[in-house]
Amino acid sequence: MCKVKMKVCEGQYLRSSVTLESRQLLDLQVGKSVLALFKASAATVSKDKTEDVSRCFLFGQVSRLPQKDKGGEVTLRLPNGLNVVGFIRGNHGLEVGSEAYIQIPEQSVVIALLG
């Protein structure tokens, strides 16, 4: 297995674990542009960043969320304008415009080639 670190925006990265064979088949090299995918149901949105080394954290601003007393899908806009979606539990205390973190387990991040 090898770890792949992908820059999402300034100071924010996603990590993934791939087999050596996958690394070779994808011809992964430093500086190569790739597409990183994860299911929204694998990502958790929260107001605070927890210290969990097995997860990647991205920081952004809430642009869409469910009612405060209900959980559901939340969209965060990252500083570079990208939108990412994750889930949050009910009674979350966030509002549109709030700053929040999305936590993604590195084993949930899949790498694909562009084009």
What residue ranges belong to the model's regions?
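Flexible glycine-/small-residue-rich
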Residues: 6-10, 38-40, 78, 104
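N-terminal intrinsically disordered, low-complexity, charge/repeat-rich segments that act as generic
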Residues: 1-17
